[in-house]
Amino acid sequence: MVMMLWYVLPLLLCSPCLLIQIPDEYKGHHVLEPPVITEQSPRRLVVFPTDDISLKCEARGRPQVEFRWTKDGIHFKPKEELGVVVHEAPYSGSFTIEGNNSFAQRFQGIYRCYASNNLGTAMSHEIQLVAEGAPKWPKETVKPVEVEEGESVVLPCNPPPSAAPLRIYWMNSKILHIKQDERVSMGQNGDLYFANVLTSDNHSDYICNAHFPGTRTIIQKEPIDLRVKPTNSMIDRKPRLLFPTNSSSHLVALQGQSLILECIAEGFPTPTIKWLHPSDPMPTDRVIYQNHNKTLQLLNVGEEDDGEYTCLAENSLGSARHAYYVTVEAAPYWLQKPQSHLYGPGETARLDCQVQGRPQPEVTWRINGMSIEKVNKDQKYRIEQGSLILSNVQPSDTMVTQCEARNQHGLLLANAYIYVVQLPARILTKDNQTYMAVEGSTAYLLCKAFGAPVPSVQWLDEEGTTVLQDERFFPYANGHLGIRDLQANDTGRYFCQAANDQNNVTILANLQVKEATQITQGPRSTIEKKGARVTFTCQASFDPSLQASITWRGDGRDLQERGDSDKYFIEDGQLVIKSLDYSDQGDYSCVASTELDEVESRAQLLVVGSPGPVPHLELSDRHLLKQSQVHLSWSPAEDHNSPIEKYDIEFEDKEMAPEKWFSLGKVPGNQTSTTLKLSPYVHYTFRVTAINKYGPGEPSPVSETVVTPEAAPEKNPVDVRGEGNETNNMVITWKPLRWMDWNAPQIQYRVQWRPLGKQETWKEQTVSDPFLVVSNTSTFVPYEIKVQAVNNQGKGPEPQVTIGYSGEDYPQVSPELEDITIFNSSTVLVRWRPVDLAQVKGHLRGYNVTYWWKGSQRKHSKRHVHKSHMVVPANTTSAILSGLRPYSSYHVEVQAFNGRGLGPASEWTFSTPEGVPGHPEALHLECQSDTSLLLHWQPPLSHNGVLTGYLLSYHPLDGESKEQLFFNLSDPELRTHNLTNLNPDLQYRFQLQATTHQGPGEAIVREGGTMALFGKPDFGNISVTAGENYSVVSWVPREGQCNFRFHILFKALPEGKVSPDHQPQPQYVSYNQSSYTQWDLQPDTKYEIHLMREKVLLHHLAVKTNGTGPVRVSTTGSFASEGWFIAFVSAIILLLLILLILCFIKRSKGGKYSVKDKEDTQVDSEARPMKDETFGEYRSLESDNEEKAFGSSQPSLNGDIKPLGSDDSLADYGGSVDVQFNEDGSFIGQYSGKKEKEAAGGNDSSGATSPINPAVALE
């Protein structure tokens, strides 16, 4: 059995060996036990004639206990009494007095029970038996009570006396309760008090009812007739106490019980009662006010409740008071109660009996129920400070003692035995137990021993040596062993040995010391923003033999994932908290635990964010509104762990701008009030927003609205301008005042104007709109202008004078060009002379320079002109034109402009010199053999001059030699060049440049070689699909891989399933073909596919055709001869013809849109090469047009179209006799007499770049 050591520690706190009784585990010995009272009746019993009376007295002991009783100190024999039944149960001396004999009065008295055996006598406490008869109200004659209206009266109850508590009810003859209030109430004594009577109190049936719970009966007093004499002159009087009647009284309250104080007063008007405790505050948590404040109940009275309690009765005429002086006393209570013990011979026995009470109780001792004074004087005892001490006890000293404490409020009795016994030592802890603990902790090995005398206990290690030589080992008085600061080498076996004068015994305890749990990486404290997520990480090391776990706590509460919320995510030692809120901040701890230990690592999470709303926004100092001021104050906002930097004060005017807030300014974050300067006539509603480093928080609740008084404007409009929109007017404009600057419900503007410098009388007009049109002015004349704000309270300040002008006309003069300086082939400088300002007819705003490309110097463009513009400031008379095309003609115009528009233009034409060409287009490499490559290219889009040829250079990328080889190709019409003697094992970098007289231009670069460097050719992404009688093999040719031929062989499996005549024959295929379709296969048949070259297997595949089984393949013809196929092809051809006719009809309708027109809007004739990533197929104009008409159709099914990249594909390129090129690579004859046909099949298509849809580049 393995014991976890945290369960052991409470056992170490038990008393050592000397127990109240012999342990149950101590078996195998016949041990006697002195008498012990186990149950007895309460100290006071109140019984009634019909009740059965049971007096209980039960006790245990060995040998069997005998019982005897005394009544009023005289021996009482229950068995000999008539009507008494003795209980014959074991361990019981109880008896019952039966209630049907009405003998209760005869058995009244004080009883005591004695339980005895050979070892002593135990004694019960005194039991007082009180017998009551049936309650009866004494016969009396009740006289009517007469009283004048407004006077006080007391209706007495005087119920019969009773030993048991009773309840009093006042009712009338209809069994309705008398209504009680501050004027009418019942006292604790049962009397009914009237502070003053009213005529409505006049009744003849006031009945006092007494309820006796013991007899379960209610008896009534004779009805009282209350007669109230009406009066017309009720006299007010001050309060007088009806109970108690004197000014003060003294009471004794018992500690731990309740104290009830009562004051009932009379007077008119009806007095009110309140209670005072002059010396100390009233203990409100223990005070209950009842009966309309006339009764004070103080619960659980303590010594601190000593003192004066005053009741005060008050009305409008005066007051009356009564002082209760309360003394708190106490019945005896235990400080230390004597306990029974077992002792061995020769030991000293000590029984402590410490009691307390007020007054101090008297303590007496008894031995076996007899007063200690009557015991033989040779007993070895003494009494010291209330304790009974016996020295050198022997078995004959076994006894039962009684300690009794008594004062006037009660008595206490305790039985305790001294049992002197000789018992052999015995270890009650199980033998061979295993204990586990972790390194660094404290282990507790149990050894519970019992015997008399008390056994001595020692612990030994495996070698029989005492363990106490190590200071880490410490014994407990009860025999257990503690080992602090455990180490791994403490693991082992330990022996506990217990011995007394009769024997010695030994048990084995096994200790296993495990590795302590350690947190290797604990969570770290962090600061996160509200709404973010935080991750805490925890890693720990555990003893591998223990079951371990990692849990998380937040502020001491266990955290777990919840199915209805994703707030927490816990996995693999991580705690993730999502959507952080301020309530999430606190301490988070990782708890790594095993069944032996647990360690905890804490981290603090601080959630920060923008502040909370500003509370308690208040307005004050309203008298300042007349001066357009107000005082605003607020309480600090919750800063959410980031200091508040400032408060933003905003206002809203719900009349002029509802739901729009304007800032009045900001104050420092440590300021919580400010006096605001306000504008006249604004309906201010304020709010305040706190701001910290994380931004503004929620605004405060809005304040109440205040309105400032109206006033004359304090500002005039700004940005006053005078400009004409016609040649004979002037439009005066200004920026209107904001509504908050109106200072009144409405605003107008007083506008004044006059010609500048003529000192004429000001003309004026008052308007509401923010503009005024002055008509019939001369062209471009200066005016003085003033604009002043006006409202119903007066005018604004004197406005400033602004100079404006009437309308402008178009400039009448063109700039005179001075010269044009050519910087280089793409940049020129244009200069002109300043214009005459008098001819500008307005403010000279600048110059507009317009220029456009007219065409190459070889040939002018006929397409749409695209013009470029440049605006030059008025103080500048030159412009640099850059980004021009080399070797081109340009037209330039310069115009002056004012606010009205542009004037006449000065024109000039210039040409740019020749430049270097752009890079050639579409350089491609085609492998001819292992040592040769054919290079294809297209001329550059931008010649920038006259092409003189091409410069080709290349060098190997690998190998030792990096020598650059150059070829100067002087034929500008050349489009291909063949390179030989290349190394098949190397890759090359090829660079091609076009040249003009200015030199080579930008290069186009490609890298490649003749063959793959290693192994077999690469069939990238090769795949195979199958139908019922065909299969398609597809692959992606690798760029730079030489084209080569190989054959594909389909072989049916298993062999023999298909006859040799029906086996497909090997077919030759080109690598660049990228796919191959094998027809005439058998359905539902598996085929092996071999790709072979010169008997070398290049690739191996397998495929299975669809269908239900082999079919006979026709040897007379293919499916192309079937009727359905012929009809299908005919339908397609007919559809294509219809589409072609529709296309020609459409082209003929738009015939005016020729290739020439389209080229004018897109490209120069120099820059219309046809290109494709696979070199492009150049055809005659007619064939090109035909291809474009069917550019989107699929190839025919007869397989006659030759795939791109085949061995014969070069025949389709530039060698065609129908194709002619001019010097820059464009087609000769594109504009020669076939315009309509060209328009029908020209560059209209928006399809992708291809040999039949060439890309068009704009120059």
From Swiss-Prot:
Subcellular location: Cell membrane; Cell projection, Growth cone
Signal peptide coordinates: 1-19
Pfam families reported in the protein's UniProt record: Bravo_FIGEY, fn3, I-set, Ig_3
Transmembrane stretches, start-end: 1123-1145
Gene Ontology BP terms: axon development; axon guidance; axonal fasciculation; calcium-mediated signaling; cell migration; cell surface receptor signaling pathway; cell-cell adhesion mediated by integrin; cell-matrix adhesion
Residue ranges annotated as Extracellular topological domain: 20-1122
Tissue-by-tissue expression: Isoform 2 is predominantly found in the brain, while isoform 1 is found in the peripheral nervous system.
UniProt similarity note: Belongs to the immunoglobulin superfamily. L1/neurofascin/NgCAM family.
Identification of the protein by name: Neural cell adhesion molecule L1
Gene source species: Rattus norvegicus (Rat)
